[in-house]
């Protein structure tokens, strides 16, 4: 009898063990939940060609706040679910998913059975104790085919086009604008819904995505068949890109900086006198009187008297005007003092004696907008240039120093800086866009900023590539940086034609702007800028107006005219960006996905 009882207990224990290993399956809308001994997995179709995957440990939760994804309701889809001892098979009209019950890993196929992508191993959760919270390092590995190319991830100025065999750290800096969206020549994309430091790595064995802070692992697999369709799926989840006013696609004249009203108006008048095509003039920083009044949100009356009349004169000459503002605020400004009274400022003092406001706090964003509206929009400003939205608090120069300084701030309105490291620009642009649209529907929103994150295309913001130096190598790297940025689903990108700095930040022209060698580089960068989504000259140390480049100026004028001759075509493409989720600046693999010779070409595009 004793041996029979022992045998029965062994059988029962084995059955329980096998049940724990194979997992329990629960049907949910458009998908299933799988529960195993040490991992929970949720698979849901958000469209026939988009699947969301959430994985979490038993002690954690599937719940989370998504800042990037705004599609929060599931459509009615005809999803079939079949279960056997080992697998759960989910089928939509476009995709089949195999969920392995033993360990919760997934494999994706077309409806005809062709492999799309496979998870290489089960998800990895490593408990970690951080300042202010306990969480997990999270990681998912994938198995790719050897012959596919990978693109996206935002803007990285390392000169690489195809990210096969590469490692990329996703941390915002002055010249790195990151977004965790990856796209393949095989017609799939992954949107990785995490805001902390993230590392993409591709080796011969596996491709992996690792993030520093997460309660769960959350990603979307988008299968479009073509790269255009994948990007459309990304925008289905995160928002459409609005159409700018036609003027925004014309030429933008800027420099660091126009020092007073007379200089600004004289540049506008000189362009019209010379009959050089142009739509836009930009007032950079220091329209305030000192660092203590940094980003005060109104013109210094001594340098720019009667700003409303000044802008009326600009508008009367068929110009639009954009102005630079910062999330860092000087201590003598009224906006700083009201932010401080409400507890909306971070304690860290920035490099120009300012403090940054907490853009994760909706009330702080509303207060920020109040000062913009009353001091700048009210006098006729057409567009906002929001600088330093990484945020680059202390003028850090590397990803490591930027990460360290941002984390040192500690907490924001939503949680720890480690958890929301990369999302400052997204939440700030989101709220600025919403406030502008709520206040007036008479003018389309245009903004320029130096950072990006997934979803930011919905905010009417263009990103520029940061404070680059002037050199041929840096110029070359702009091309692959801009292409991968646009292939990450964010359609509007630009750069400082001529480089922000001539003889520093990697710039090599120590003899200044009158050096013919620099003028030649400027001309080539100007020609490239002609064929970028947004056409903008900007920089320091030397004037950037078209007539300031000696024998090279006629070449600049020629390409400026070419931009305007192309305007009907450019504006038609811009409508396709909004209406059809098109990409204007196209890496060659988008149009030649079956030609491996195009995969690493980072100096050509469509």
Label for each model-derived stretch:
Residues 92-118:
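Hydrophobic or amphipathic alpha-helical targeting/insertion segments
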Residues 41-45, 95-101, 188-190:
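Broad, structure-driven detector of short, well-ordered beta-strand segments within folded domains
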Residues 114-606:
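Catalytic-domain carbohydrate-binding cleft regions of carbohydrate-active enzymes
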Residues 29, 38, 76, 85, ...:
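Short beta-strand-initiation
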Residues 29, 44-88, 126-127:
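A low-complexity, Ser/Thr/Gly/Pro-enriched, surface-exposed linker/loop concept
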């Amino acid at each position: 009898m004793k041996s029979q009882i022992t045998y029965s207990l062994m059988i029962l224990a084995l059955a329980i063990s096998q049940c724990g290993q194979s997992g329990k399956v629960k049907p949910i809308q458009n998908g299933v939940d799988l529960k195993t001994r040490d991992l929970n997995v949720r698979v849901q179709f958000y469209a026939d060609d988009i699947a969301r995957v959430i994985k979490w440990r038993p002690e954690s939760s599937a719940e989370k706040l998504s800042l990037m994804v705004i599609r929060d309701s599931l459509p009615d889809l005809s999803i079939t679910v079949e279960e056997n001892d080992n697998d759960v098979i989910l089928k939509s009209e476009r995709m089949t998913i195999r969920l392995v019950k033993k360990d919760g890993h997934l494999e994706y196929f077309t409806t005809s059975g062709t492999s799309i992508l496979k998870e290489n191993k089960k998800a990895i959760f490593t408990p970690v104790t951080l300042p202010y919270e306990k969480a997990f390092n999270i990681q998912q590995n994938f198995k790719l085919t050897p012959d596919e190319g990978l693109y996206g991830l935002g803007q990285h100025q390392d000169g690489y086009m195809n990210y096969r065999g590469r490692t990329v750290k996703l941390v915002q800096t002055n010249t790195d604008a990151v977004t965790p969206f990856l796209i393949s020549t095989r017609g799939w994309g992954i949107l990785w819904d995490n805001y902390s430091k993230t590392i993409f790595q591709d080796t011969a064995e596996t491709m992996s995505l690792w993030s520093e802070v997460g309660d769960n692992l959350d990603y979307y697999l988008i299968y479009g068949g073509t790269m255009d369709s994948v990007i459309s799926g990304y925008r289905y989840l995160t928002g459409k890109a609005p159409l700018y006013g036609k003027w925004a696609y014309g030429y933008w004249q800027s420099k660091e900086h126009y020092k007073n009203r007379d200089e600004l108006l004289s540049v506008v008048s000189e362009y019209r006198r010379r009959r050089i095509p142009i739509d836009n003039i930009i007032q950079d920083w220091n329209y305030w009187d000192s660092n203590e009044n940094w980003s005060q949100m109104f013109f210094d009356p001594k340098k720019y008297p009667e700003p409303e009349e000044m802008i009326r004169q600009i508008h009367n000459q068929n110009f639009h005007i954009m102005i630079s503002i910062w999330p860092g605020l000087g201590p003598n400004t009224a906006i700083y003092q009201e932010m401080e009274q409400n507890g909306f400022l971070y304690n860290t003092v920035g490099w120009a004696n300012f403090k940054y406001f907490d853009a994760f706090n909706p009330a702080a964003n509303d207060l920020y907008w109040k000062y913009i509206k009353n001091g700048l929009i009210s006098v006729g400003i057409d567009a906002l240039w929001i600088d330093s939205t990484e945020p680059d608090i202390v003028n850090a120069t590397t990803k490591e120093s930027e990460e360290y300084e941002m984390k040192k701030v500690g907490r924001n309105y939503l949680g720890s800086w480690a958890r929301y490291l990369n999302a400052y620009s997204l939440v700030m642009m989101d709220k600025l866009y919403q406030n502008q649209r709520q206040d007036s529907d008479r003018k389309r929103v245009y903004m320029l900023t130096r950072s990006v994150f997934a979803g930011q295309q919905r905010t009417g913001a263009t990103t520029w590539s940061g404070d680059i130096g002037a050199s041929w190598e840096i110029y070359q790297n702009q091309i692959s940086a801009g292409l991968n940025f646009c292939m990450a689903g964010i359609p509007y990108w630009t750069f400082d034609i001529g480089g922000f700095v001539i003889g520093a930040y990697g710039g090599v022209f120590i003899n200044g702007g009158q050096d013919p060698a620099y003028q030649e580089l400027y001309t080539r960068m100007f020609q490239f800028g002609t064929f970028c989504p947004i056409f903008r000259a900007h920089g320091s140390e030397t004037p950037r107006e078209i007539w300031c480049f000696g024998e090279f100026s006629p070449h600049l004028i020629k390409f400026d005219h070419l931009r305007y001759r192309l305007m009907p075509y450019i504006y038609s493409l811009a409508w396709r960006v909004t209406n059809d989720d098109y990409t204007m600046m196209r890496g060659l693999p988008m149009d030649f996905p079956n030609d491996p010779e195009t995969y690493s070409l980072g100096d050509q595009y469509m």
